Amino acid sequence: MQQAFRHISRILLGLLTTACFDTLSILPAAAQSCSDDEYYYPYAEREERRPLLTSDTTLFYRAVQGAEDLYGRYTDFALPPVALRRRGLDYTSERNTLSGIGLSYRYFTLLRLLGAEESRFSGLQSGPGMLPGPGGGTLFRFPDGEPLQPYLVSVRFADRNYCFGTRVSGTVRLPGGWRLAAGADFRTGRDLHVEGVFTNAVTAGFRLSRTFDGGDALSLLCIVPVSMQGMRLSTSEEAFALTGDRLYNPAWGFQSGRVRNSRVRREMLPLTVAAWETPLAPSTALHLTLGATAGKNRYSSLGWYDARTPMPDNYRYLPSHTGDRATETAWLSDDPHYTQIDWDELIRQNRMAGGHAVYALEDRVERCWDATLRALFTTEVDRRLTLRYGAEVRLDDRRHYKEMRDLLGADHIVDIDQYLIDDDTYGTLLQNDLRHPDRTIRTGDRFGYDYTLTTRHAQAFFEADYRSDRFLGALWLSLGHSSVNRRGHYEKELFPGSQSYGPSRTLRFVPWTVRATAGWSFTPRHYASLTLLASSRTPEASDLFYQPLYNNRTVGDARAERIFAAEAAYRLTGPRVDFEATLFTVLTLDGMQTRRYYDDMSYVYCDLAVTGIGTWSCGVELAADIRLADRWELTLAASAGRYRYVRDPVVTVLSDVDNTPVDRGSRSRMGGCEVGGAPQLTAAGELSWFGRRGWGVHLSAGYAGRRFVEPMALRRTDRLAGQGGITPEAFAAFTCQERLPDAFTLDGSLFKTFWFSRSRLTVSLLLKNLLGDSDIPYNGYESLRVRRISSGDATYYTPHATRYMYLLPRTFYLTISYRF
């Protein structure tokens, strides 16, 4: 009976609708604007028979399955600005990409100005077609649509790193279907807290794109960052105490009454990315990308030739070493002739040296050429299974050399090894470039060393992404081949012929990655997943050579670093609360590092290699977004973990002048040390209020605890700790790791938005470190040097003081932006 009634109702409804349509079709349509189509009929769309829509149940679960990194988003600006190695991992574990091309942080601001959207991924997660790693990353992409307010102009004022900045951006339509987005970011001024620190930087770029009728898409991106920054150096606690200034910076001094910084970083590293996307079949598309970075990175520092170091905080100039009252009085009185670089004195000594410089300002130059070609195929087998596969090749070519910036009143120097002039054994082997001996170096000339490190990499990859209602399964496989070599452009007299000149032997590696993910959506709001990863990666090229400046000798036990990781995550999304919890563990094996230093035990300049480094990280990350009311929001995030060294690495020390062993195969007592610069306890919270008429307030608090200084493997060997630690106290000084104080900061911001018909104006004030606490160390670094103390016939050893850097006190950012 009910079915018959439904059929009769549908027939009557259909007849009534048809009659209405017939009547309306003969009425005049003065208010209806007809198109040029002679068959135009305003109700034709309503008469079409539409098939009954069938819902895709996988759509209900994809939102909760694809949520972003909540912990990272909530802690980026809420935690104290201390050294933060998330999960105890090195920054190289994090991958930031655009169309598969690796990105540096220096390009992020302009990408956002040009309209790029970014997705954050934590830990073992990654975006589509993005090479996974243990440290997560950021995926940038440009959306297809156009912004509602395509133009931006903003100005900002600050007291940290710079004083004034401005940003402009805009998007326009060009003839032929092209779209152009352009932007620029400018910063200038000195730091109002730390003397000698300044920034003069401009970054400009554009993106030109077009989508063709057949579905093809072409884009060209170019970003050019140019910057000059005065840097800040770490120093010992004694120097901070003597000056009474936690922001003491030993890198600057007065020259003719004006502040001059010896450590200035100058960069110009343009980025170009060209992308072509084309459909090959109804279910397959090709995304071809070519990216390149080319430019120079310069870092200046003072050089001294057969003279005393000009750095004022050198241990020999501190009262603890000199032991005289006059030095202590000079430091306590903040006499800049003692506490800072005395540029006028350096120039005076140069003018007394008969034309040859005793002191000079050098630039350490890195000329980069990094190019990547990537082909990504995407095949949608059906609505549940998507395959991504392809290959990429990369060339990373970096040339390093020194260039004379300022002779400080002198006329020239001779390109010889100044440190060997008084050496009884090697004093006759002084030439830095044997093929051009005794070259006279003047301002702008290249000298000292000149070499190129080249890494070639090729890999193929495959990714399968399967979603079936509640279940998500993903698999990533990649296999590659890498080769690394050095090419010397100078022939060092200490290491003649192929020992320093020409190509070194080529080191080859086979990096690979396997990652598997399984997830289950219990409801459209509850999701849990498990991810496993195993991989090996090529070491940094500079860590494969004992002395890359002028020696082709490679580290003997060079291996690819191995990584094993697991991650279990739970995610809840709801109308009031978003919550995420992640358990993680990461084991890294066969890491390696190389250093160059002066060995106080043997009185020889040495090359150090540390191999077989192993670390283990495990812990939990929690994050929640709670919408308390329509205008109130609370975000919370916390983490707890343990990041430590789990193996005793092998330490090899070679003499820098002849490669004779100083210490070979010694074990370092690193097992049990904590990873430095990685807080093992963090917590952050932010309360936000969004008022009427565009007002808003953010108040946030951050905590970072269980922090440790960066440990050095050398001082924990038998040669140093065993020989130098003749008492329990001395042994502990070499082997125990210092814990840094916990950090707590409070931040606040106030903003007001004025809305107009098609534009808006926003004024915001951000205050960092409201409590003004400047006694919080940013980080600490153990020294490689050892101090010898003689008392009668006995000689005692103690490590050099740890070097620190402290947080800035209360700082502000005032921003005025206009979108239209």
Which stretches of residues belong to each language-model region?
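C-terminal beta-signal and adjacent terminal beta-strands/loops
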Residues: Q32-S33, Y703-Q723, K752-F820
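A beta-strand signature from Gram-negative outer-membrane beta-barrel systems
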Residues: R106-R156, G165
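Transmembrane beta-barrel wall of Gram-negative outer-membrane proteins
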Residues: F157-G189, H193-R232, V264-S283, S478, ...
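Acidic/polar loop-and-plug regions of large Gram-negative outer-membrane beta-barrel proteins
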Residues: S209, A217-A275, R298-D363, Y426-R442, ...
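Surface-exposed extracellular loop regions of Gram-negative outer-membrane beta-barrel proteins
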Residues: T235, Q431-T440, S483-V484, G488-F495, ...
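Outer-membrane beta-barrel signature, preferentially recognizing the C-terminal barrel domain
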Residues: N249-L271, A275, L453, S504-T513, ...
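Signature of Gram-negative outer-membrane beta-barrel scaffolds
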Residues: A360, R388-T523, V650
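Gram-negative outer-membrane beta-barrel transporters
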Residues: R467-R470, T585-L587, C606-R715, S817-R819
